[in-house]
Amino acid sequence: MSFFSGFFNKKKSKYSKKIDILAPLSGDIINIEDVPDVVFSKKIVGDGIAINPTGNKILAPINGTIGKILNSMHAFSIISEEGVELFVHFGIDTVKLRGEGFKQIAQDNQKVKIGDTIILFDLNLLKEKARSILTPVVISNIEKFKNIEKSSGTIIAGKTIIMSLYN
């Protein structure tokens, strides 16, 4: 043990593990509280962020398994290898479009890696027909984590960290 070893001890994090969630869509991060649907804005289904999307695809934001892609193709759940239960819901009232403007690429129960395409969408059509295109990305089992750190600003699908969860 050297004379200086006690001088440079790094402060240990109070969390044992950090799990990063990447952007499933490109666009701008919006506060979840600003989504025009109380189910999301009041965090009834979980905590997270929303994205004002650009582009035309929704990618896997984590390595894991697709739980369910809704028949209307506007939303899906994914469970990560670490047990994160994540829900991506494109737009508000998009269920009423019954799949119009969406094309499913991935399948229920499919294993996916970060960046794999899950759903393609026609942004111009959805801007015209949906009540809102704000896309909530929420952690439905948020109570299992000690802390959530949310990013802000412009993001790139499959590249930018949008949230970090800590155990």
From Swiss-Prot:
Q: What is known of its domains?
A: The EIIA domain is phosphorylated by phospho-HPr on a histidyl residue. Then, it transfers the phosphoryl group to the EIIB domain.
Q: Which UniProt keywords apply?
A: Cytoplasm, Kinase, Metal-binding, Phosphoprotein, Phosphotransferase system, Sugar transport, Transferase, Transport, Zinc
PANTHER family according to UniProt: PTS SYSTEM GLUCOSE-SPECIFIC EIIA COMPONENT
* Gene3D superfamilies reported for this sequence: Glucose Permease (Domain IIA)
Protein known as? PTS system glucose-specific EIIA component
| Enzyme active site | H89 (tele-phosphohistidine intermediate)
Spell out the InterPro entries in the cross-references. Answer: Dup_hybrid_motif, PTS_EIIA_1_perm, PTS_EIIA_component
Q: What does this protein's UniProt record list under function?
A: The phosphoenolpyruvate-dependent sugar phosphotransferase system (sugar PTS), a major carbohydrate active transport system, catalyzes the phosphorylation of incoming sugar substrates concomitantly with their translocation across the cell membrane. The enzyme II complex composed of PtsG and Crr is involved in glucose transport.
Residue positions where Phosphohistidine is found in the record: H89
